[in-house]
Amino acid sequence: MAAKTVQYDNIYLNLSEKPGKLRIAPSGLGWKSPSLAEPFTLPISEIRRFCWSRFARGYELKIILKSKDPVSLDGFSQEDLDDLINVIKQNFDMGIEQKEFSIKGWNWGEANFLGSELVFDVNSRPAFEIPISAVTNTNLSGKNEVALEFSTTDDKQIPSAQVDELVEMRLYVPGTTAKEDAADGEEVEQNAANLFYESLKERADIGQAAGDAIVSFSEILLLTPRGRYDIDMYETCMRLRGKTYDYKVEYSSINSLFLLPKPDEQHVVFVIGLEPPLRQGQTRYPFLVTQFVRDEDMEVDLNIEETVLKEKYADKVKASYDQPAFEVVSQIFRGLTGRKVTTPAEFLSHEGHAAVKCSYKANEGQLYCLDKSFLFIPKPTLLMNTSDITRVTLSRVGMSVSAARTFDLTFTLRSGTSYQFSNINRVEQSALVAFLESKQIKIHNDLADETQQTLLTSALDDEDEEGDEEMEEALSEDEDFQAESESDVAEEYDENAESSDEEGASGAEGSE
């Protein structure tokens, strides 16, 4: 039979939101949607085989490629199968493998790596398939448990209420398995979870992290999450490799960079903001906090060809660096990610530092007053944009103001969330208030209210003491006062009563 061109309408490409038209021709196939400017084309030279199965929107024609991720075309009806078999046979001289997915609902089976996919089989039928390129991170979360983290959509036009995404999966891999030893060629027993983890990690590097790293940094100290990591930086992503955890971070997920000197004058921190955050089990890390010794130098050469450096990274990065380590790392991050590095604003503490020491709950740290935000480090790292702050309250709880050497600072955001930072030295109050006023942030000073209340209470106490003394004086008996005799009382009420003087005189006369 002669080859022919066939068109199918309302077909979705790789779970696209809107459908398009699929055209199958002798040279390959193409897909075009009104919502996209450029069509998707696939030449016959890249196609390995075709698969047919039940899918999200009816039936799917899955195309397995020789060197890339599989292509999913769904939206077909069951009646389209016979026509597709004939067209693909005529144009490509290939058949269509019909697959039935397991619908038993079992949560145990076999995990196999097939090309660029991880396939979970139940009774020799696939239960689900995961493109390895979608795995951004994998970690051993237990002796026999492997955690897989997946990339999330970056389409911010889709309302969050309409987006349900798989972000993490955990697989329990029990027992041991045999692995050939590269040294002597003999098979050795190895923990099955470890082998699965190493295999997945190796395959997950295929894709955007493929090729040689542009630059690598060794033994970089991270305060959050705690540990030392090797950082490999590629064209569009970086990898953090630690003793326990490995992470892959897309540059597109880096939303902020901060370079901040610590008050101890010996260290400098470089903070990397992430969205979505890094995950370790149930713990999320929206910020990576790295720390460098101020006097430590670093010398590196970038693995970039001179022509590429001039064309793609002109005025962004240099071919080589030999300067303080914190400057080298921050400048390379700025050049490769395209993000601005935020440094301290004009704020200076009482001791001339860019931050004030304080505590958030039970954690001690530093609060930086930046041009457009306030940042608390290291743990937990909290960022409060100036535009989101409704008011700041100064207070001192649990101690009289006159005796307090520290005070608390509470930030209230438009969302209703509040953050209280305590144990701030009293000498920092004037500088903080002046900075808040310069940013036109509403300030509620409970310290002044408490001071006035203390003075009023003290005045009332003094008045009470004076009143008590007057009352005591009124009620107490005069020491110079002597009570009169009963005769004095009689003289006052009885005119015939003899006075004591008369009695004394008559007595004297009688004696004479």
UniProtKB/Swiss-Prot annotation:
InterPro entries: PH-like_dom_sf, RTT106/SPT16-like_middle_dom, RTT106/SSRP1_HistChap/FACT, SSRP1-like_PH1, SSRP1/POB3, SSRP1/POB3_N, SSRP1_DD, SSRP1_sf. Its main location: nucleus. It holds the Pfam family PH1_SSRP1-like. Disulfide bonds: none annotated. SUPFAM superfamilies: PH domain-like. GO terms for biological process: constitutive heterochromatin formation; DNA repair; DNA replication; DNA replication-dependent chromatin assembly; nucleosome organization; pericentric heterochromatin formation; silent mating-type cassette heterochromatin formation; subtelomeric heterochromatin formation. Keywords: Chromosome, DNA damage, DNA repair, DNA replication, Nucleus, Transcription, Transcription regulation. One of its GO terms (cellular component) is cytosol. SMART domains: Rtt106. Disruption phenotype: Sensitive to methyl methanesulfonate (DNA damaging agent). It comes from the Eukaryota. Residues 460-504 have a biased composition (Acidic residues). One of its GO terms (molecular function) is nucleosome binding. It is found in: Nucleus; Chromosome. The keyword DNA damage applies. CDD domains: PH1_SSRP1-like (cd13230), PH2_SSRP1-like (cd13231), PH_TFIIH (cd13229). Residues 460-512 are annotated as: Disordered. Component of the FACT complex, a general chromatin factor that acts to reorganize nucleosomes. The FACT complex is involved in multiple processes that require DNA as a template such as mRNA elongation, DNA replication and DNA repair. During transcription elongation the FACT complex acts as a histone chaperone that both destabilizes and restores nucleosomal structure. In contrast to the orthologous protein in animals and plants, this protein does not contain a HMG box DNA-binding domain. This function may instead be provided by the HMG box of the associated nhp6 protein in the FACT complex of fungi. Forms a stable heterodimer with spt16. The spt16-pob3 dimer weakly associates with multiple molecules of nhp6 to form the FACT complex. Interacts with abo1. Belongs to the SSRP1 family. This is FACT complex subunit pob3. It comes from Schizosaccharomyces pombe (strain 972 / ATCC 24843). The gene is pob3.
